[in-house]
């Protein structure tokens, strides 16, 4: 596992668990209407997060991988077509053993865009096509602002969870798209500053994610959503997440073989097409599921999937890098 990924696993995953424990110990503190005023803090935090995302998003960095349209099409189909269909199939099969909130959680997981940081990092470790990974992970994040609520409407009915689709899209435009556009407009002035302080901005972003997880679970504990659930719930979610991860990885491998991808494109496809963004998932949940008392339960499949994709990806990436290096050395020796 590479050093950046190891550091991310070392502190962030236990921190997520710690946020859940804190919510369980004193849910009234971080619940809606509590002393932390989370309903205001989260709205401001979400808008700041997407402003920073727009500020750090460099479209110039995408040009290196922009022309590989077969890779782009395969990744986006994996993220926004194969993944949602696989998740819908899992939910239909496991429906007798899942509550409505948990079914919605898996649908929500499957509708999310790919993650940027770990997709690109793992692709680099595995000696894959990094420009292609950067392009597709970034494109996926942009498309997700629109496609995620649309998939929720089609598969699970976000209208039933919050209101109507129109109001959800309005909230997304107001709290996500507008701040991101403002951040992009400020890049000529603040872009260099953001690049110098990228590590601090990423740390702030992760702290915001932890706060959003904490507040979501506070609401769930305050409404006694967890009453009647046991540790077997975590086991079931872990199994379901593992099944989805395996299905997507094998599907991406099959597509890569079908299209005749080389090692670089194959690695980028697998890592970008099989991953889901915890950051955007938690932040968008505060917009799409603002009035959902079981938001903590809805986010649980995403949190477990996030841990799974980091751990398994961290194991696979160096092995694939070694295999690619051995193959290159063998070809060089024959030549």
Identify the residue ranges that each predicted region occupies.
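Alpha-helical transmembrane segments of multi-pass small-molecule/ion transporters
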Residues: 1-335
């Amino acid at each position: 596992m590479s050093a950046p990924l190891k550091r991310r696993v070392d502190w962030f995953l236990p921190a997520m668990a710690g946020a859940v424990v804190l919510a369980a110990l004193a849910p009234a503190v971080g619940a809606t209407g509590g002393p932390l005023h989370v309903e205001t803090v989260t709205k401001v935090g979400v808008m700041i997060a997407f402003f920073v995302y727009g500020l750090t998003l460099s479209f110039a960095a995408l040009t290196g991988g922009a022309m590989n349209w077969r890779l782009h099409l395969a990744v986006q189909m994996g993220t926004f077509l194969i993944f949602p269909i696989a998740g819908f199939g899992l939910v239909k099969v496991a429906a007798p053993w899942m509550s409505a909130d948990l079914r919605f959680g898996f649908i929500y997981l499957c509708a999310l865009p790919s993650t940027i940081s770990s997709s690109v990092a793992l692709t680099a470790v595995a000696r894959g096509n990094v420009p292609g990974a950067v392009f597709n992970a970034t494109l996926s994040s942009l498309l997700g602002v629109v496609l995620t609520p649309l998939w929720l409407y089609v598969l699970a009915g976000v209208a039933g969870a919050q209101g109507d689709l129109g109001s959800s899209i309005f909230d997304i435009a107001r709290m996500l798209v507008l701040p991101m556009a403002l951040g992009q407009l400020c890049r000529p002035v603040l872009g260099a500053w953001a690049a110098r302080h990228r590590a601090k901005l990423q740390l702030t972003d992760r702290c915001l994610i932890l706060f959003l997880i904490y507040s979501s679970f506070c609401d769930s504990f305050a409404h006694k959503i967890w009453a009647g659930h046991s540790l077997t719930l975590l086991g079931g979610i872990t199994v379901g997440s593992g099944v989805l991860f395996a299905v997507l990885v094998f599907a991406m491998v099959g597509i890569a073989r079908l299209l005749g991808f080389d090692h670089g494109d194959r690695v980028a496809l697998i890592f970008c097409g099989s991953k889901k963004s915890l950051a955007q998932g938690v932040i968008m949940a505060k917009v799409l599921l603002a009035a959902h008392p079981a938001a903590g339960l809805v986010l649980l499949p995403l949190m477990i999937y996030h841990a799974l994709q980091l751990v398994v990806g961290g194991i696979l990436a160096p092995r694939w890098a070694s295999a690619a290096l051995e193959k290159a050395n063998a070809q060089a020796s024959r030549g």
